[in-house]
Amino acid sequence: MKVDILSREYPPKVYGGAGVHAEELSKVLAERVDVTVRAFDGPRTAADIPAIPGTDPKGSLTVVGYDVPKELEDANGALKTFGVDLQIANDVDADIIHAHTWYACLAGYLAKMLHDTPLVITAHSLEPFRPWKREQLGGGYNLSSWAEKDAYEHADRVIAVSAGMREDILTAYPNLDPDKVVVVHNGITMSQFETPADDDPGWKVFERYNIDRNKPTLLFVGRITRQKGLPYLLQALHFVDPNIQVVLCAGAPDTPEIMEEVKTAFAKLDEERGNIIWIEEMLPKPELNALEHGCDAFICPSIYEPLGIVNLEAMACGLPVVASATGGIPEVVV
């Protein structure tokens, strides 16, 4: 059997939970079947392809990356996405198509019609529940919403990453047959979150960012987007004991405007209480794992979160999680 996984994110271009999901799913599926990942952000090299777990895989893993067509380089973000989708839809060659997020939904829907191939969509978020995306896409938000709606309503199966997400899907798309929508919770590979050895180079992240391992420390990990609630967290931290150190791993802003908003709020907080470190880069996995093992609690202030893989990862590192009760978070934070 051949499965084509369609995703905007895939290593080394991963910035959120959907990318983590796509990577881990592709590796596990490739133990059993032939998998081709068709992803955004340009060609991949052999070094970018993750290793298939297990000693005797029955399948294979191929990764094909696509660039935005030159003619669309200055176009609206949604049109750039559609330019990649058209290339992917043309190339699909599989028994099952599995699309992730609205970015790849149109590719999946077009490929389903073009090649008469069953389409599965995993719902990581929903455009109707993210109105702030209009800040990023402008009128393109109308296009992304249209593409997502059509793809979902014509999919052969829709996977919700939580029970809360399933309810949201059926609310957003009432024409969708409820029997086609199933819940498969996101998971993680526990062995990836074991405590690093004392000489593990990942611990150097504390020295590089001047993080004091002897102080009680709160950790936030997430993109700079309305969804993740970082501006609210920066306001709330004014009321937290200044002796508590705060580390923010926050980058990949949706828009220049929200980046400026966060910079202003951070500067105000830093002036008032200090003891706060902002890491804007995407940390390598060994460093993020060490950071989570070296902190004392994890904060997730999301205002919209279908599941929240970051919470699973934090708990796997033994961190208590303080999270907002939204979406699928109450199903996994226990």
Spans of features found by a protein language model:
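Short hydrophobic beta-strand element within catalytic cores of glycosyltransferases
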Residues: 320-323, 333
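Short alpha-helical donor nucleotide-sugar binding micro-motif in glycosyltransferases
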Residues: 289-295
